[in-house]
Amino acid sequence: EMERVNCPLYICLNMRNRYHDPYTDEPGRNRFWGGAIENIVIENVRAVNAETPSILTGFQTARIDGTPVRRAVRNVHLRDFHVKYRENPAYVNVPEVTPEHLFGYPESNAHGDVDASGIWARHIDGLALEEIDITPRAADNREIIRLHDVR
């Protein structure tokens, strides 16, 4: 059980390159396109007085030649997930497009405001949500769950 937590759940696959290697498309040389987050089961979560939505995200970008690159978080199962948000004023400024946040340190507040009040998921292959109970702030009029590029 969590009390006064900022972000109840944060799963982020991005391209943070801590080795400072130059980005290249050369096979076998670049850690940039690597990495995976997959086969996750999270259950029996209780959070009260939460501040920001849970965020689950992979990434999408393009190679130097413009070829799209998509790295999804795969096979995530949330079960028995209960979150109640803190009743304080909500000052939300959701951009038309949420940036990918590819290079910075992966932390929930780096994404800024998103268009969900409870769970925001993007670039996910295989997301199962069971027994989800989210109570947003009374003043928050965003949808509780938003899925973008979730297959």
State where each predicted segment sits:
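Extracellular/periplasmic carbohydrate-active domains that bind, remodel
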Residues: 1-151
